[in-house]
Curated annotation (Swiss-Prot):
It is found in: Vacuole membrane; Cytoplasm, Cell cortex; Endoplasmic reticulum membrane; Cytoplasmic vesicle, Autophagosome membrane. It comes from Saccharomyces cerevisiae (strain ATCC 204508 / S288c) (Baker's yeast). Keywords: Cytoplasm, Cytoplasmic vesicle, Endoplasmic reticulum, Isopeptide bond, Membrane, Transferase, Transmembrane, Transmembrane helix, Ubl conjugation, Vacuole. Catalytic subunit of the vacuolar transporter chaperone (VTC) complex. The VTC complex acts as a vacuolar polyphosphate polymerase that catalyzes the synthesis of inorganic polyphosphate (polyP) via transfer of phosphate from ATP to a growing polyP chain, releasing ADP. VTC exposes its catalytic domain VTC4 to the cytosol, where the growing polyP chain winds through a tunnel-shaped pocket, integrating cytoplasmic polymer synthesis with polyP membrane translocation. This is Vacuolar transporter chaperone complex subunit 4. Residues 1-630, 673-699 are cytoplasmic. The gene is VTC4.
Length: 721
């Protein structure tokens, strides 16, 4: 789909006169080139630049006016909401209809914000594409020059966070008829009869504002301090992750080892924040019956360095807390035990700052209700804090001091920073056993707005990206970072609409001018990140329309032996290769998969040279039980054969005693083989190795030994008689 066609289909009718005149600019570019026999002059360049300036002024002015209008409308509705709420305790309280009118007005404002964000995004894409086309066709490089003009009129950089928070508060009041739910945001966390599930998703920057607006219609933005006006800095979260030079914690978390820990120091807000949280995250496998846990305690910033060095003791950390007596003694003792363990690990493993993560978080949750909690982290950035290359970035401090929360941290070298291209959505559900999540949540996580990325970790991504020369294994999502996660929108019940009508004009997936219909079709069928574990069930292969006819894909060995058999020069060599092929088939498996005809596989995603992709593997408890049952079954065969041997040895004739030797040897061989196979399987399962667990030798070996034992016993008796 050409961008001009996409623009004409996606434009909002009310804003149609204010869009970039992309087709006119494209026509001007092509006509001037054709009139000058493909030559581009400085005069033509000046004229084209003036046309771009006119379009930029038009778009920027409209965005500025519309943005001011939205803020004015929000302010007016805020006054109406406050007035309506004050009347609740009067003699003439407002009716339900009054709140419904306010809710409709806010829904209309939400639609305006959505349309304005879409308008800005589409026009910015238009400018980028026409400049790219200009540079490609004329040979003049306009992009860096015009980028300065775009930055001077940044209609595409409007931040809607403050607006989203304000609208969320007002919408929550209107939706609850002036009685918004209040309570502890952490309530409900200790109830037991719940199924807790956490899933993570990537969100393309084009979809961030729309996603926020959709969520706030169902959950309010969680504001921790309602007594102060929201500021941009309030949403900032910074974490310093610790590890040693061997990256032991990184590899433990990457492999999801049982008991793998992550240690970090975290603070909320700007650099003036005095309270630092010392946190430890511990991974637990499902088979242990325990849940992964995060534990933390607070520490004053001035004591952090001494605590990490062991100079500031645990008793000193909690001396004031003990003296005040505001918390139960058992809780204080638990915190002291946690602090002691963290300090011990820090010193023993020689942990030091390695990676910093920074992001602005928007949290959505009903206060006092932990059933659905959603957080959206934007401007995610990872920064190096280590000294592994000989550069002491922290200067023996617990964090580097040359940056704060001034994203995008332009003062840093490119080798020290990784600006993550997507936002990270985290959905935490807590439902009754057997209960489905809310319908709107299911639609949201299944929509085109998000891309599932199971087990995504900021710490793992930061280390794998910034310390690429030190790591051998990388997370499964890293080779896919260049894959476009945008997908064509599908109709849902959660899309942003104006009250009283439906708006299905959205089609937010942008294609380059050179893109053709084949690419669009490929995107329609694309499963996104092909290594996502949950998605692999449904998207094992990217397939064309399938039929019932299956075709066979043979292994390399099978194909080799088939060629040898066909090209055999004499019957003896042919028979030889047939026998070898038979044993290869028996010991190495069929290695033949029946797949629908027309299926194709995506083989473009590969690990970088010298790296291995670590895919998280979940080992169910039943795997261990099945291994033990198999071991006990073989053990019972060994015991049975041993019992036969012992019986013949004890109660049989002298000839039978000699015949029992065969059964004894068979019993011993089965026992040794069983123990070896069991030990090998347990180790492979514990290490989550992708190996063949089938025992191809055992059954045949037992059968052969048993036959030989019977024949030997029969022969002994035959000779004796």
């Amino acid at each position: 789909m050409k961008f001009g066609e996409h623009l004409s289909k996606s434009l909002i009718r009310q804003y149609s006169y204010y869009y970039i005149s992309y087709d006119d600019l494209k026509t001007e570019l092509e006509d001037n080139l054709s009139k000058n026999n493909g030559q581009w002059t400085q005069e033509l360049e000046t004229d084209f630049l003036e046309s771009l300036e006119i379009e930029l002024d038009k778009v920027y002015t409209f965005c500025k006016v519309k943005h001011s209008e939205v803020f004015r409308r929000v302010k007016e509705v805020q006054e109406q909401v406050q007035h309506t709420v004050r009347l609740l305790d009067s003699n003439n309280p407002p009716t339900q209809l009054d709140f419904e009118i306010l809710e409709e007005e806010l829904s209309d404002i939400i639609a305006d914000v959505h349309d304005l964000a879409k308008f800005s995004r589409l026009n910015y894409t238009g400018f980028q594409k026409i400049i790219k086309k200009h540079d490609k066709k004329t040979g003049f490089i306009l992009k860096p020059v015009f980028q300065v003009r775009l930055d001077s009129k940044p209609f595409f950089k409007e931040n809607y966070d403050e607006l989203v928070v304000k609208i969320s508060q007002l919408y929550d009041i209107a939706r609850t008829s002036g009685r918004p739910i209040k309570g502890d945001s952490s309530a409900g966390g200790k109830q037991q009869n719940f199924v807790r599930q956490t899933t993570k998703y990537w969100v393309h920057p084009d979809n961030i504002t729309e996603l926020k607006l959709i969520i706030l219609k169902h959950l309010p933005v969680l504001v921790f301090n309602t007594n102060k006006e929201f500021e941009r800095e309030d949403s900032a979260i910074t974490s310093i992750y610790f590890d040693n030079e061997n990256l032991d914690l990184y590899y433990g978390r990457l492999r999801k080892d049982e008991g793998a820990e992550a240690h970090r120091l975290r603070w909320y807000g700007g650099m003036s924040t005095d309270t630092i949280f010392v946190e430890r995250k511990t991974h637990r496998e499902d088979w242990t019956g325990e849940k992964s846990v995060k534990a933390r305690f607070a520490l004053k910033e001035r004591h952090v360095n001494d605590f990490l060095k062991g100079k500031y003791t645990v008793d000193q950390v909690f001396a004031k807390m003990r003296k005040e007596g505001k918390k139960p003694m058992n809780e204080i003792e638990n915190l002291e035990a946690l602090a002691s363990e963290i300090q011990y690990v820090m010193l023993k493993k020689k942990l030091r700052p390695v990676v910093r993560s920074f992001y602005n978080r928007t949290a959505f949750q009903l206060p006092g209700d932990a059933r659905v909690r959603i957080s959206l982290d934007t401007e995610l950035t990872m920064v190096r804090e280590d000294n592994f290359d000989g550069v002491d970035r922290t200067h023996k401090n617990w964090r580097r001091t040359d940056i704060g929360v001034d994203w995008p941290f332009k003062q840093l070298d490119d080798k020290d920073i990784c600006r993550f291209p997507y936002a990270v959505l985290e959905v935490k559900l807590q439902t009754q056993l057997g209960q489905e999540p809310p319908e709107w949540v299911r639609e949201l996580v299944g929509s085109h707005l998000v891309e599932p990325v199971p087990k995504f970790s900021k710490f793992i991504h930061g280390v794998a990206t910034l310390l690429n020369d030190k790591v051998d294994s990388i997370p499964f999502w890293l080779p896919q970072m260049d894959v476009d996660i945008r997908k064509p929108p599908l109709p849902t019940n959660i899309e942003i609409t104006r009250p009283g009508r439906s708006d299905n004009e959205d089609n937010d997936f942008d294609e380059d001018d050179e893109d053709d219909a084949a690419l669009v079709a490929a995107m329609t069928n694309a499963p996104g990140n092909s290594l996502d574990i949950e998605e692999s069930v449904g998207y094992g292969a990217t397939s064309a329309p399938t039929s019932n006819t299956n075709h066979v894909v043979e292994s390399a060995n099978a194909a080799y032996y088939q060629r040898k058999i066909r090209n055999a020069e004499n019957p003896i060599s042919k028979k030889y290769y047939e026998i070898v092929a038979f044993f290869d088939h028996y010991f190495n498996g069929d290695q033949i998969s029946k797949i629908p005809k027309g299926t194709t596989f995506d083989t473009q995603i590969r690990a970088p040279p010298g790296k291995t992709i670590c895919v998280p593997v979940r080992v169910e408890p039943k795997v261990y039980f099945a291994t033990e049952r198999t071991y006990l079954s073989w053990l019972s065969i060994s015991i049975l054969l041993g019992g036969v041997s012992t019986t013949l040895l004890t109660y049989g004739s002298p000839t039978a005693m000699i015949g029992s030797i065969g059964f004894f040897i068979t019993s011993l061989a089965v026992l040794i083989r069983t123990v070896m196979v069991y030990a090998k399987r347990v180790v492979n399962i514990r290490l989550k190795r992708a190996v063949d667990y089938e025992d191809k030798i055992g059954p045949g070996m037992v059968s052969v030994f048993l036959i030989l034992s019977i024949l030997f016993s029969f022969f002994c008796n035959l000779v004796a008689k």
